[in-house]
């Protein structure tokens, strides 16, 4: 699998299931619209007072499942990373990544409390269950940089 192959699969899916944990360690999940940077960063927007934003400010560890939620999709990416809330030039860069997938995101910029979250990957598992045996590949952050 090449870098382009993995990015192409991840970018084909505009939505993912995002998970975080609350301050009391309760698991919480949400479907979010995602954009994927060339460095495998995920970007999504949310409101600052949403459960996910509050959780990620307290504990930036986050996980996603991309793909595999439709009957015709037999491939998935499991993604673990660290979230942050960029500002300044970095915020503008990640916003442009997000707007390339969700142009209507610009219309939400005036929403009170809107934030953009960037997630840097620590670990990705790509699984394709179509071939037998299934193809399962794992990449840590160092391997992703070399891919």
Residue ranges and their predicted role:
Residues 10-11, 57-58, 99:
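Alpha-helix boundary recognition
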Residues 1-4, 50, 100-104:
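Charged, amphipathic alpha-helical segments
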Residues 21-22, 66-69, 104-112:
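A short, aromatic/hydrophobic, helix- or strand-capping loop or linear motif
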Residues 50-52, 71, 132-134:
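Short, surface-exposed beta-strand-loop junctions and turns on beta-sheet-rich folds
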Residues 13-48, 56, 62-67, 75-79:
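Short beta-strand segments
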Residues 48-49, 122:
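A generic "binding-loop/recognition-motif" signal
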Residues 75-147:
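Charged, gly/pro-rich active-site loop segments
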Residues 1-17, 142-147:
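Extreme N-terminal tail/first-helix region
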